[in-house]
Amino acid sequence: FLFGFIDNLKGTTIPAILKDVGFNYSKGGTIIFSEYTGFFLATFFAGLLADLLGKKFSLVLAGLCLILGVIGYASSSHLAMFVAFIFLIGLGLGSLELSGSNIISGIHEQHKGRYMNLLNAFYGIGSIITPILAGHFLNIGFSFRTIYRYSLFVIVPITVYFIVMRYPRDTAPDEAEKKIDFKDLIQIISQKD
């Protein structure tokens, strides 16, 4: 839900942002590009962080990136600040997506498909609710800043839940499933067929 909620907030609010700070659509595109750049980079590093520091760490880090990103984004007035903070939001969203999928796959090995479908259904619910709520708030005169700040009422409790939630212990990997360190990862990537 959180991923769909935050991911779809930008689409509804970008026209209000451009109007509020006097940006053109080119600068708006730069802002949106920055979020997806953060998301893209998170797809490479979230799994590695989960392997090195644990699944809980990567999920909590995702929540913290979202909190800091939203606070900064809602307070921004210069393009560089918007770009930096929405990049942080993108990192949080990418880490959240990968960490959530990773945890669900590990916990529900027998019924992965069912639980991954549920995860995506909740993404869809967040994606549907967000434009409706954000559009309503914009229509009654709220600023995009207020809308992003209100999103903290969703992000903060979920992040606190990530912190206090108990995660099942990973089973000890056998020799075939041992963790890959960074040097091994570079070797695998640089091998030629």
Regions found by a protein language model. Give the residues of each.
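Flexible cytoplasmic inter-helical loops of multi-pass small-molecule transporters
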Residues: 163-184
